[in-house]
Amino acid sequence: MVTLKMAIIFLMEQIRTPFSLIWTIMSPTVLFFFLHFNEIELHYGDTAWLGKQISWFVGYISFSVVLFNYCLYLVGRRESGFIATFVHNMDGRLLFIRSQLIASLIMSILYVFFFILVVLTGFQASPDYQIVMIILKSIYINAFMMVSLTFMASFRVTFQTASTIYSVLITVCMVSGIVSLKYNEGIVYWINQVNPIAIYSTILQSDQELSLMTIFFYSIMLIISIISALTFKTEPVWSSQ
């Protein structure tokens, strides 16, 4: 019950930032229609085709939420000195992280649902089993990614530095994903083996499977993140300077 109450508080705080909310929702939606504008008439009402096209965009939206609505919020609350006032033991740390994870997971569901709804409306297509599975898969992938990447919120850096790191990371992932459409060899191939956006896209498409390298890499990240959550520092960086 306490977890749910805190999750609702954190969720309401995220909703109260309208510019970030609108930008996260609208930017990939506008980009999708920009890239597929000439195909609206050709694939009018084609839900099966849309299901294959939206996986990468769902991955981008979801990974953005993981980085900026989850990891960055954890860093921001730590650096504001907010959690140091009431989190003094492991139970408190886990309660805080768990509540933020639930709030961010709800936000990711809203983002993905809105994006898919707008795309289906634009193409006058009806949702089918494939679309429902994409939404359900995105939920459990988001939950896993948030848990696996929790260690990124434990870096002892300032909020601004963390924001810069996350921005660079999502840009690299986005660019490598786009480049792989034309060239997927060498370093581009290896980056995409651990690229969260590419992993989302792979899992959301039922005819593709993850490589052993990807599974091994994220298993290690999961273990590191569990340790990071248990030892999460609540004191802001500036307090020790």
UniProtKB/Swiss-Prot annotation:
Compartments, record wording: Cell membrane
Keywords, sorted A to Z: Antibiotic resistance, Cell membrane, Membrane, Plasmid, Transmembrane, Transmembrane helix, Transport
CC annotations in GO: plasma membrane
Annotated transmembrane regions: 17-35, 54-72, 105-123, 131-149, 163-181, 212-230
One GO term of the biological process aspect: response to antibiotic
Membrane-related topology note: Multi-pass membrane protein
Keyword Cell membrane found: yes
Primary location group: membrane
Main function: Together with two further proteins McbF and McbG this protein causes immunity to the peptide antibiotic microcin B17 (MccB17), which inhibits DNA replication in enterobacteriaceae. Immunity is determined by two different mechanisms. McbE is involved in the production of extracellular MccB17 and, in a complex with McbF it also serves as 'pump' for the export of active MccB17 from the cytoplasm to the periplasmic space.
Name of this protein: Protein McbE
Source organism (scientific name): Escherichia coli
